[in-house]
Amino acid sequence: MNLTLKDFHVPNEWNVKSINDNSFIQECYQKAIEMNIYDKSDEKGKAVMYHALTVCPAFWPTVTYDQLVLSGYLMLWLILFDDDLDTVFIPDDEATEIINRTELIFLEGILPTNPTKKEEFTLFFRNQVLKMSGNRLDMFNLFLNYTIQWIHSIIPLNKTIEPHMDLFLFIRKLNVGVYPLIGLSCIFFSNDKIDQSLFLNPRWLKLCEATSIVTALYNDCVSYAKEVKGNAGVNNCLWFLQKKNNTSIQDTFKYICEKSNMYIKEFQNHEEKLLNQYNNIQPLATLLNSLKYIMNGKYYWSMNTARYASPSSPFIEIQNAVSPDNKLINNEL
């Protein structure tokens, strides 16, 4: 059984060459060592972090080095936070406490009682985002809203019963973690030339939703072997739709592709109409391009990272994503 990710429709014009410089990862890694997030002897932890952060130039191919470092801190924080909670093995009350303590850090800018090393890193990251925001407190608040919304979306899908697809997409568009990326892009690319009414415009909200859902559908396909091995298949639509609908993996994948392609068409439709609503098009177009780069970056990066690589994957591209770190990051079924 060999499926191909080429069945997803990704517009060619969205494909922008990413920055060919991963030196920012070392800076992020050194900060993680300095804050006792990782131990220097932890080769697997280093490999997991490295391959997670290589997505940053794909998501943000046009940013400065300092912005790339901040994006690296975001991805590092996402994997630290999500890996603890995105499992059926942690009790809900314990997960809720972690979420509430993290929300306090983002809202108040202070540490909770007896903070963990990860919580100390969360505060450091939050303050770095505030610093990057400069005088754009509105964009910092938008980032906070998107990020807090995400952390509260993790537990609802951390269950053992397959959800209805509509309910899954409603929660998954938050749960997949794209909204914090969008929030950071708003800090990077928003300026005084963008009409602030944009961020309350229903079309902007629909564009963000489409970006998140398309990325989630890509993610569930490329991470299929990794998540099934990690007993997280119940939250993977490629897995649970087969079980729920008694369909083959081929037919299930076809359905997911059709869903993704539908949302991309919806994105293009809303983009065109949104650009026609505003006078100063170029700054807005730059911001909207950043949403495309998230979808496009996830698609192409996923085929070349050890984070998902597995000979057991049903997808040819993931089977062939060979890396020296494949032995450390074992996704075999």
Curated annotation (Swiss-Prot):
Pfam families, A to Z: Terpene_syn_C_2
Transmembrane portions of the chain: none
The protein's Enzyme Commission number: 4.2.3.-, 4.2.3.47
Motif NDxxSxxxD/E motif mapped to chain: 219-227
GO biological process terms held by the UniProt record: terpene biosynthetic process
Coiled coil: none
Chemical reaction(s) catalysed: (2E,6E)-farnesyl diphosphate = (E)-beta-farnesene + diphosphate; (2E,6E)-farnesyl diphosphate = (1S,2S,4R)-beta-elemene + diphosphate
Keyword annotations of the record: Lyase, Metal-binding
Superkingdom field: Eukaryota
Gene Ontology molecular function, alphabetical: metal ion binding; terpene synthase activity
Motif (DDxx(x)D/E motif): 82-87
This protein's record includes keyword Cell division: no
InterPro entries to which the protein is assigned, alphabetical: Isoprenoid_synthase_dom_sf, Terpene_cyclase-like_2
Main function: Terpene synthase that converts its substrate farnesyl diphosphate (FPP) into the sesquiterpene (E)-beta-farnesene as major product. Is also able to convert FPP into delta-elemene, beta-elemene, (E)-beta-caryophyllene, 9-epi-(E)-caryophyllene, and a yet unidentified sesquiterpene.
Family: Belongs to the terpene synthase family.
Protein name, entry field: Terpene synthase 2
Organism of origin: Dictyostelium purpureum
